[in-house]
Every structure is written in C-alpha cells, then in structure tokens.
Amino acid sequence: MENQYKVELHNVTKEYDLYRSNNDKLKHFFNIGNVDVPRFWSLKGVSLNVKPGEALGIIGINGSGKSTISNIISGIIPQTTGTVDVHGDTSIISIGAGLKWNLTGDENIRLKGLMQGLSIKEIQAVRDDIVDFADIGDFIGQPVKDYSTGMRSRLGFAIAVHINPDIMIIDEALSVGDDTFYQKCVDKIMEFKKQGKTIIFVSHNLRQVELLCDRVAWMHFGDLLEVGETKETVDHYRKFSKDFKAQTAAYRKKYQVGKKKEQADFDIVAYERQLVEEKAKDSDKSKQAVSRQVHRTLYKQILPEKMTIATKLVMLVAIVLFVFFALVNVSGHSVTSAIENPTVLLHPVNHYIKSQSVLFNSK
C-alpha cells in the first residue's frame, strides 16, 4: 500500500551541545566525569507531514529551526528524539550543500550521482545538462574551492535537479544568482511539481513561497507555530513581522533573549510527561503502559550519544589488543612467544637484534 505521506515527523526535537572545548567533548562522549555542557534546543517537539506531490514552504525568522528541519529530513543530521520517516530519495539544495571543495565540478557530479545510486552511464547522460544548467563553463574542471558562492549554488542546484530525486529540499538556494538563473530554477521547480514530485522549500522570500508552495509551515524559535494554506499562513507571518518591527529595539531584544532562553531551558523530560498526559486522556491503557509506549516512540530511532559500560569494555579490549599486536610487530617475535613471555615486548629492538645475531652465528 502506498504511503499517505512522503515525509512524516512526529515529536521531533534537536538538541545541540555547546561544548567549551574538545576535552569537554571527549569527556562527554566517553561519559567520564561530570561535564557541565550548555545546551540549546533548536527544535522543541515538531510534528509535520508532507503529502506526495505537495510543495511545502517553511518560513520563520533566523534561528527558528528551518534549516535544522531540512537537514534532519535529508539525513544530514539526526534528531534528538521523535521519529522521522522519509519515503523516497531526498536531494537537498542549499548554498554549496554536499559539494566537496577539493574536488572539481566534474568530480562532484560523479560523486553525487553515485551517492544517489546512478550508474556511470546514467551520470554521463546528464552531465552536459548539468553543466549547461549551472552555466559555469570551463570552471567545471576546476576545484569547487575556487568557485564563487553563486557558482557553487548553481552547480549544487543543477546536480540536485538532474539526478531525479523523489523529494527535493531547497534551503535558501534561490537567494544567490541573477534573474536568468532564478527563472531557470523556478521553471525547473514548476516542472517537478507537474511531475508529482514532493518539494520542501525553505526561504525568507515570501513571494517565492507564495509562488511555489501549496502549504506553509511557520517555525518560531524551535516551535511549529502554524501550518496551513499558503496565503493564510504567510499573511499571519507578515502581520507578525510588521508588528514586531514596529516595536522598540529594547522590546525586540528582550523578546528574542526570552525566546532563546526558552530554547536553552527546554526540558525533554517535562515534554515527555506532557505527551503522556495528552495520550492517556484518549487511551484505555494504564498510564504506566502509555508512558512506556511514548518513551519507546520518542527514542526508537535514536542511537545513544554516550558510551554504555559494555561499549567502554569493548573499546578498552580493542585498544589493548591493538597496542599488543603493534608491539609484537615491532619486536619481531611471534604472537605465541609474546604470549608465553611478555617481557620480550619491553625491549623489542635489543631482543630482536640478539635473536638475529644468534641466527647469523648458527649459520
């Protein structure tokens, strides 16, 4: 049975640990000591669905979580909690996204194509179309690090739209480039819409959103404030922006500081309790059973960020074995002799020379 939605997000959060140093990062990873790490929640429980063939716009002020959502959907970064189900191949288009700067334009085309499952023959078939669309001429043979921002954006867009993804994610990619390239991009996006492709369009440009999108999601400091028909949601966002800009600078500053503090103070445990309370109202199961179900759902796609005791033991054994075999290799002795007499590893060079001398004299 075909999925009702192409993209499904349920109770998705994203936490960033603001490490003060690399030492703190290592201590936290290995779960050593009590490291006080400041945290910031870019997403605070977002649930969102995108239908097949739908163009969904994502709007919001800077820092609202728009790009975080697009990166999670595309698989660039993982969510902290919640479920993300994407039914189809995704291709994200942002300024320079996915391009390897030390590779040439041609090499990037091949790499991106292979990563999307295309054969060399299929990549060669679209190569010229990509170069023509990007309009970068002889620079296609130069390293991407030598490109301008506009050239990188054009190449990234051209590659993404020619590898035929099921879901195209466009993150501010139309903000760079001249009017001619912009129109080519719009025409290509409209062509994708006619083909029934799913599009997620992240932008500050409300006119572009109104032109291209069927529905719009309004993100606001990590929360999904509203999702609905394009005109209605964009009108609400415009009114908010107008009213906000009319406030004094002191008010705007205080408001932003307060919202960012809410993101820093977000309590995932309290959020989970809230979900349990809401679900328990409509369930005939016990609250304890509902709590277990909610917890499983929140964390079933999540890998642990810290090492468990078992993992630490495995790592310790692996390190010991690595050091042991390295010393055996340097000493010139067999593994068996090193196990029977480990002291030979303490002075490997001298012992190895003596053994070679004995061998030479015996001849």
Curated annotation (Swiss-Prot):
Annotated residues for binding of ATP: G60, I61, N62, G63, S64, G65, K66, S67
Claim: Translocase is one of the keywords in the record: yes
Membrane topology, record value: Peripheral membrane protein
Chain segments annotated as transmembrane: none
Region of interest (Unknown), residue spans: 247-363
Keyword terms, alphabetized: ATP-binding, Cell membrane, Membrane, Nucleotide-binding, Translocase, Transport
Subcellular localization(s) per the UniProt record: Cell membrane
GO CC annotation terms, alphabetical: plasma membrane
Catalytic activity: ATP + H2O + teichoic acidSide 1 = ADP + phosphate + teichoic acidSide 2
InterPro entries: AAA+_ATPase (IPR003593), ABC_transporter-like_ATP-bd (IPR003439), ABC_transpr_TagH-like (IPR015860), Bact_Polysacc_Export_ATP-bd (IPR050683), P-loop_NTPase (IPR027417)
Main location: membrane
Cross-referenced SMART domains: AAA (SM00382)
Entry EC number(s): 7.5.2.4
Alphabetized GO MF terms: ABC-type teichoic acid transporter activity; ATP binding; ATP hydrolysis activity
PROSITE patterns assigned: ABC_TRANSPORTER_2 (PS50893), TAGH (PS51251)
Signal peptide positions (record): none
Domain ABC transporter: 27-246
Family assignment from sequence similarity: Belongs to the ABC transporter superfamily. Teichoic acids exporter (TC 3.A.1.104.1) family.
Quaternary structure, from the entry: The complex is composed of two ATP-binding proteins (TagH) and two transmembrane proteins (TagG).
Function, as annotated: Part of the ABC transporter complex TagGH involved in teichoic acids export. Responsible for energy coupling to the transport system.
PANTHER family: TEICHOIC ACIDS EXPORT ATP-BINDING PROTEIN TAGH
The protein's name: Teichoic acids export ATP-binding protein TagH
Organism: Lactiplantibacillus plantarum (strain ATCC BAA-793 / NCIMB 8826 / WCFS1) (Lactobacillus plantarum)
